[in-house]
C-alpha cells in the first residue's frame, strides 16, 4: 500500500523526525485497520524512540487545538487519513 501520498500540513519538528513520523504512520496503516490501533502504534513507537509522552490522533474528520513541546509537533495526511502527532507532558 505505497500509494498513500504524504502531505505535511503543519510541522514544528526536525526533518528527520518528520520523515520518521511518516514512515511510522505508513507501517501502522499497513498493519492496522482501526484508527485507534493506528494511533496507538505511532504513539508507542515515538514514546520508545523519542521518550514519552507523545499523543496521536488519527482520523478523517476532526478538529484540534493542542499545546505541544517546542519542536515536537506534526500534522499530516497519508492519503485520506489525517494524523496529528505531538509531545506534551
UniProtKB/Swiss-Prot annotation:
Effect seen on changing residue 88 to E: Abolishes homodimerization. Abolishes interaction with BCL2L11 isoform 1 and isoform 2
Crosslink (Glycyl lysine isopeptide (Lys-Gly) (interchain with G-Cter in SUMO2)) position: 43
UniProt region (Interaction with ESR1), positions on chain: 67-89
PTM info: Phosphorylation at Ser-88 promotes recruitment to DNA double-strand breaks (DSBs) by TP53BP1 and ability to inhibit MRE11. Phosphorylation at Ser-88 appears to control the dimer-monomer transition. According to PubMed:15193260, it is phosphorylated at Ser-88 by PAK1, however, according to PubMed:18650427, the DYNLL1 dimer is not accessible for PAK1 and the phosphorylation could not be demonstrated in vitro.
MF terms (GO), sorted A to Z: deoxyribonuclease inhibitor activity; dynein intermediate chain binding; enzyme binding; enzyme inhibitor activity; identical protein binding; nitric-oxide synthase inhibitor activity; protein-containing complex binding; scaffold protein binding
Its biological purpose: Acts as one of several non-catalytic accessory components of the cytoplasmic dynein 1 complex that are thought to be involved in linking dynein to cargos and to adapter proteins that regulate dynein function. Cytoplasmic dynein 1 acts as a motor for the intracellular retrograde motility of vesicles and organelles along microtubules. May play a role in changing or maintaining the spatial distribution of cytoskeletal structures. In addition to its role in cytoskeleton and transport, acts as a protein-protein adapter, which inhibits and/or sequesters target proteins.
Subunit structure: Homodimer. Monomer; the monomeric form is incapable of binding to target proteins. The cytoplasmic dynein 1 complex consists of two catalytic heavy chains (HCs) and a number of non-catalytic subunits presented by intermediate chains (ICs), light intermediate chains (LICs) and light chains (LCs); the composition seems to vary in respect to the IC, LIC and LC composition. The heavy chain homodimer serves as a scaffold for the probable homodimeric assembly of the respective non-catalytic subunits. The ICs and LICs bind directly to the HC dimer and the LCs assemble on the IC dimer. (Microbial infection) Interacts with human spumaretrovirus Gag protein; this interaction is critical for intracellular microtubule-dependent viral genome transport toward the centrosome.
Similarity section: Belongs to the dynein light chain family.
UniProt-recorded name of the protein: Dynein light chain 1, cytoplasmic
Species whose genome carries this gene: Homo sapiens
Amino acid at each position: 500500500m505505497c500509494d498513500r501520498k504524504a502531505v505535511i500540513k503543519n510541522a514544528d519538528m526536525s526533518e528527520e523526525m518528520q520523515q520518521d513520523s511518516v514512515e511510522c504512520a505508513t507501517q501502522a496503516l499497513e498493519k492496522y485497520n482501526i484508527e485507534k490501533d493506528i494511533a496507538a502504534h505511532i504513539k508507542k513507537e515515538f514514546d520508545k524512540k523519542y521518550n514519552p509522552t507523545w499523543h496521536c490522533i488519527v482520523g478523517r474528520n476532526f478538529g484540534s487545538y493542542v499545546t505541544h513541546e517546542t519542536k515536537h509537533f506534526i500534522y499530516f495526511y497519508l492519503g485520506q487519513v489525517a494524523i496529528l502527532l505531538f509531545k506534551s507532558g
